[in-house]
From Swiss-Prot:
Family annotation (PANTHER family): ATP-DEPENDENT CLP PROTEASE PROTEOLYTIC SUBUNIT (PTHR10381), ATP-DEPENDENT CLP PROTEASE PROTEOLYTIC SUBUNIT-LIKE-RELATED (PTHR10381:SF26)
Organism: Streptomyces avermitilis (strain ATCC 31267 / DSM 46492 / JCM 5070 / NBRC 14893 / NCIMB 12804 / NRRL 8165 / MA-4680)
Protein localization: Cytoplasm
Reactions catalysed, as given in the entry: Hydrolysis of proteins to small peptides in the presence of ATP and magnesium. alpha-casein is the usual test substrate. In the absence of ATP, only oligopeptides shorter than five residues are hydrolyzed (such as succinyl-Leu-Tyr-|-NHMec, and Leu-Tyr-Leu-|-Tyr-Trp, in which cleavage of the -Tyr-|-Leu- and -Tyr-|-Trp bonds also occurs)
Highest taxon listed in the record's lineage: Bacteria
Lineage: Bacteria, Bacillati, Actinomycetota, Actinomycetes, Kitasatosporales
Gene designation per UniProt: clpP4
Pfam families tied to this protein: CLP_protease
Protein name per its UniProtKB record: ATP-dependent Clp protease proteolytic subunit 4
């Protein structure tokens, strides 16, 4: 069963469901900080959010997309002139969830700094590339994967199959346009590359124009990385 039509994603067990809160997947350490207002208890995600960092470390589905969009809009309302950082380690996911986050990133006023840690695959690769030009980064051993949307729709009335096929073609065209807009690679080359999985090292992603720099330590780039 395909849970996300047109995305190539399949059903997962509850234990694997990445849209669930982090606390339901594993134990997150909490720490206490003394402030002028008293004692505050944090988890790492809350602390990162306070520092204007959004960590996208899950599959991109409707639940995680809503979380990211809410954080983007909240951080914009708190200070529309300060950058927002999005750290990415994601296997990708739903195309509609991707476009929801993508449009919100383009909509908000703050610059969006994107950093790939681990992997930015499929939909996550688009989000990595969609950061503000000059502020898109990857760690040295990160990898980026791009490919075309796909679907396993194989049954139903002919008219339904035709509708599904046309939607896949529309999504592919939209994906190609996004990659062309946010990279230095010609769209003709992109069309050829996404016929199959295209795996890029950090160096390859830099050459492709999906990122602007490779960073290995904060010491070299304190002003750029939140």
């Amino acid at each position: 069963m395909n849970d996300y039509p047109g995305s190539g994603l399949h059903a997962r067990t509850q234990a694997e469901y990445t849209g669930a809160r982090a606390e339901s997947r594993y134990v997150i350490p909490r720490f206490v900080e003394r402030t002028s207002q008293g004692v505050r208890e944090y988890d790492p995600y809350a602390k990162l959010f306070e520092e204007r960092v959004i960590f996208l470390g899950v599959q991109i589905d409707d639940a995680s997309a809503n979380d990211v969009m809410a954080q983007l809009l909240c951080l914009e309302s708190m200070d529309p002139d300060r950058d927002i950082s999005v750290y990415i380690n994601s296997p990708g996911g739903s195309f509609t969830a991707l476009t929801a986050i993508y449009d919100t990133m383009q909509f908000v006023k703050p610059d969006i700094q994107t950093v790939c840690m681990g992997q930015a695959a499929s939909a996550a690769a688009i989000l990595l590339a969609a950061g503000t030009p000059g502020k898109r980064m990857a760690l040295p051993n990160a990898r980026v994967l791009i490919h075309q949307p796909y679907s396993e729709t194989g049954r139903g009335q002919v008219s339904d199959l035709e509708i599904a096929a046309n939607e896949i073609l529309r999504m592919r065209s939209q994906l190609e346009d996004m990659l062309a807009k946010h990279s230095t690679t010609p769209i003709e080359k992109i069309r050829e590359d996404i016929e199959r999985d295209k795996i890029l090292t950090a160096e390859d992603a830099l050459a492709y124009g999906l990122i602007d720099q490779i960073i290995s330590t904060r010491k070299m780039n304190n002003s750029a990385v939140a």
